[in-house]
Amino acid sequence: MSPATVLDSILEGVRADVAAREALVGMTEIKAAAAAAPPPLDVMAALRQPGIGVIAEVKRASPSAGSLAPITDPAKLARAYEDGGARIISVLTEGRRFQGSLDDLDAVRAAVSIPLLRKDFVVQPYQIHEARAHGADMLLLIVAALDQSALVSMLDRTESLGMTALVEVHTEQEADRALKAGAKVIGVNARDLTTLEVDRDCFARIAPGLPSNVIRIAESGVRGTNDLLAYAGAGADAVLVGEGLVKSGDPRAAVADLVTAGTHPSCPKPAR
């Protein structure tokens, strides 16, 4: 029987890939590597700086758009992002649909000094220790991919390793689940991962219902400064930008434009 949704299909592949990696490097080994890694950087401090932060993403492809950019040198791209003023760099490590890898995470970690987000479909505890072992400071947890007990467990394990969890939601119900699990940083993805359809009003609906102490990240649809300002007006603390940057001719300048807009005195400030 074929998977019921796009997300189900992605998760099926992820589970197979995790099992293959764990067969090569066991849980005991990956836990030891995570423990031996340099301490994680302070993601919350980066997100709480004044203005709307930019999380810039290393992203070669996506299920919705297909191939975006070859990105033969992820370290060079990450340095351009850092030079442009990005606060955090997101690295997609899922291979089948996004053409990413843990090698990309390693390369970026060696190239920059700002926090890194490992963006993947985390369904096994193994992946959390793996993220830390490869230098991640922040880890994506997708509510739609986890039942509530797994979400709570994964969030606790992520934080126990000193990382910050970015808990992704698409609906008000998922936001409630994220809050009940104890999420401190919630990302709203305008794209429904079960269908790949986009609801651009999603963030504006969900963000006002989040407590003031929760960091709010808008995860989709930022093509330029107008989109950033719109999300800022709806309560975003930061935006995550991938496609718009990797397809730009000058990623450093593209990030810098967003950073300038996000820190300009006229930029709306999140209500707190």
UniProtKB/Swiss-Prot annotation:
The answer to whether keyword Lyase applies is yes
GO BP annotations of the record are: L-tryptophan biosynthetic process
Main enzyme class: lyase
Nucleotidyltransferase listed as a keyword: no
- Catalytically driven reaction(s): 1-(2-carboxyphenylamino)-1-deoxy-D-ribulose 5-phosphate + H(+) = (1S,2R)-1-C-(indol-3-yl)glycerol 3-phosphate + CO2 + H2O
The UniProt entry, under SUPFAM superfamilies, shows:
Ribulose-phoshate binding barrel
One GO molecular-function entry = indole-3-glycerol-phosphate synthase activity
Which CDD domains does the entry mention? IGPS
Q: In which pathway does it act?
A: Amino-acid biosynthesis; L-tryptophan biosynthesis; L-tryptophan from chorismate: step 4/5
Q: Which UniProt keywords apply?
A: Amino-acid biosynthesis, Aromatic amino acid biosynthesis, Decarboxylase, Lyase, Tryptophan biosynthesis
Enzyme Commission number(s) from the entry: 4.1.1.48
Q: Which InterPro entries match?
A: Aldolase_TIM (IPR013785), Indole-3-glycerol_P_synth (IPR045186), Indole-3-glycerol_P_synth_dom (IPR013798), Indole-3-GlycerolPSynthase_CS (IPR001468), RibuloseP-bd_barrel (IPR011060)
What family does this belong to? Answer: Belongs to the TrpC family.
UniProt name for this protein: Indole-3-glycerol phosphate synthase
